[in-house]
UniProtKB/Swiss-Prot annotation:
GO terms for molecular function: DNA binding. Keywords: Chromosome, Cytoplasm, DNA-binding, Nucleus, Phosphoprotein. It is found in: Nucleus; Chromosome; Nucleus envelope; Cytoplasm. GO terms for cellular component: chromatin; condensed chromosome; cytoplasm; nuclear envelope; nucleus. It comes from Xenopus laevis. Its main location: nucleus. This is Barrier-to-autointegration factor A. Has a helix-hairpin-helix (HhH) structural motif conserved among proteins that bind non-specifically to DNA. Belongs to the BAF family.
Amino acid sequence: MSSTSQKHRDFVAEPMGEKSVQCLAGIGEALGHRLEEKGFDKAYVVLGQFLVLKKDEELFKEWLKDICSANAKQSRDCYGCLKEWCDAFL
């Protein structure tokens, strides 16, 4: 099993609330700005897309690549973060 970042652990440790999209694991400043420009300014907005895609890993990673040019590691980290958050809070 791969280890998770501190950012990932911090995110999944509590309810999402109004956290910025940049609080998601795998999403740094550059990707965060690209997502914000497309209207995905909060983590919960990205969660909405994750749920619309029925938590499908490949569809979500492809969407993230298309919308903000996320690479494989970034999209995998973001997917894992949202999946673990959903497992804990939904």
